[in-house]
Amino acid sequence: MIGPPERATLVSVCGTFVPEGNAGVIADAIVGELEAIGRPKLLADLRLFLRLIETRAVNVVLVGRPVRFSDLAQDGREAYLRRWADSRIPLLRSGFQAVKRLSLFIAYARPEAGAAKLLPETGYSRPDPLALPERPLAIASLAVRDGETLGCDVCVVGSGAGGAVAAFEAANAGRSVIVLERGPGWSEPDLVPRESEGSARLFWDRGLAATVDLGVVLFAGRALGGGTVVNWMTSLRLPDDIRAEWEALGADGMGAELDEHYAAVEERIEVNTDETVQNAQNAALARGLDALGKPWSVIPRNARGCGDCGHCGYGCRAGAKRSSARTYLTDAVARGARVLTDCEARTITTTNGVVTGVTAVAGDRHISVRADRVVLAGGAIGTPALLLRSGLGGPAAGRRLFLHPVPAVFARYPEPIRMWSGVPQSVVSDAFARLDGTYGFRLEVPPVLPGVAAAGIVWRSAAHHRETMRALDRFAAFIPIVRDREPGRVRVDRDGAALVSYAVRGADAAMCVRAIVESAKVHLAAGALAVRTFHTRPIVIEPGGDTTAFAAAVRSRGVAANTVGMFSAHQMGTAGMGSGSASVSDPDGAVRGTRGLHVADASAFPNASGVNPMLTVMALARRNARRMLRV
């Protein structure tokens, strides 16, 4: 909680960002979200921010005037916040971004906070709920008592792309299986096309996850089925040149053997291009690429019976998305696997270097699972955190984190685009994928709903932001998926929670600059009226503008943390496979130094995949699980 004086200050900040919203409701919702995440430091940081902006002496140093924020008029408050946004001090920039993102997301995502009034201005209308599938998902969570010990042959930690496949392979081979999933269970009737509920229910840290400095927003699923429940269904195989790289790093079987696993996975999750229809945003990307003579291809997706509602990022109410929950996990349960949701694996237990099981917390109940084998599939953030809490994985555990940083580029078009409508991703271009050997970026588009848009769009003043939001239905975003080579790291805090450290630097920073410039050119070629970057002071180019000057301006401004919007939906590495001692796991995905411990998620990647990783996670999980079961 925060005290009354701090709440009053927070209300004034929220009212500055969005005067048309209900500032009191927004302020209380911010506190509620941070409390729900359950990390006391987040609230402590908020209190510090609120105290600083009310301290006259501090503000002499920070903004050059002995003022209290709450004493300023609206224009003075806006100028104050811009000083924080534009500051050379990283902590001030991150403080601004934290409160700005929360305030604006809540204002546009919650009816009582302002969305009832603000959403109609954007041109957004919530779609009618799609018809439920004939057979909704029906995976019941195992009932457990405090202090209970369960037993199985194989304990799988995580139920996403890798965990579900590993659970099925083990159960199909006749092993007894228990799956521990930190997120909640769900069924299609629980899924509604509302951002606030979907983010809180289905995403890590309620959709608010980020690197420790807030420089990169992290989107990661945390629910039964993991990221496959909330992703955009893009199903791409690992390119041949990157497979060769991985082979050189010791991850064997990347050729014909992996193709067999890809084919099996594609068949089970029904990957196809039959229903990959272009919406206006994907059509704009294709049109711009065509105009520039650049290649593009149709994206295969794991969907059947898609209703084109565009709200795939918050789960598929129609059951058309062939997530791991509806496919492999359902198959595993049919073969006897047991599932426990809302259950966090805390430590891996061992005796003399051999796995004996897992300790876990399910609400207020502490349980133990005895198992001959443990499969780690909690993702590239959750898996290393579990290894680090357990003192396993060696010095490389948590290192070599890759994020595919995305510096999105925004443009206004003369015709309606409605980024939230239709198939989210249907076009991908690898025209820029090999600008520096195997490094570059692939161009795609994201589905963007008003809450996420409001949080990400540049804020220079309340009026400026509202003006952009009022034209939201005519904006399109292109997202360059940058294959990064400079890794980050996952650590844990004193409570064992994951901390993600990552900086876009060196060659990756240069590639992000190039990605912004090339994305802008594609927008212009597609007929955009104006293109703007996501810098806190946006750089704008219009048709006929000087692209050389634009590129120079982007290069000069750079991509330092919290000076430009950056997000990641692909977290990889941190328990990478390889033949050398620098790898956490061997070429079979077995963790070095601990018998019976295996990796089956994106943390096993030796480096960045360069393409959306879901299909590769599933294929590798199938391969690694089968190798494990042969031992």
Language-model features, listed with the residues they occupy:
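N-terminal FAD cofactor-binding segment of flavoenzymes
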Residues: R175, R182-D241, Q281-D290
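Glycine-rich loop(s) and the adjacent beta-strand/alpha-helix scaffold that form part
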Residues: E169-I178, G183-E195, A223, A334, ...
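Extreme N-terminal leader/targeting segments of oxidoreductases
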Residues: P4-P5, F17, G24-G32, R68, ...
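FAD cofactor-binding and catalytic pocket of flavoenzymes
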Residues: N231, L249, G394-K521, S568-G573, ...
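Conserved redox-cofactor binding core of oxidoreductases
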Residues: L102, I106-A109, G114-A143, D252-R346, ...
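Rossmann-like flavin
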Residues: Q74-G76, L81-D86, P90, S94-G95, ...
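Near-N-terminal "mature-domain entry" segment
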Residues: M1-V67
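N-terminal Rossmann-like FAD-binding beta1-loop-alpha1 element of flavoenzymes
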Residues: G151-V179
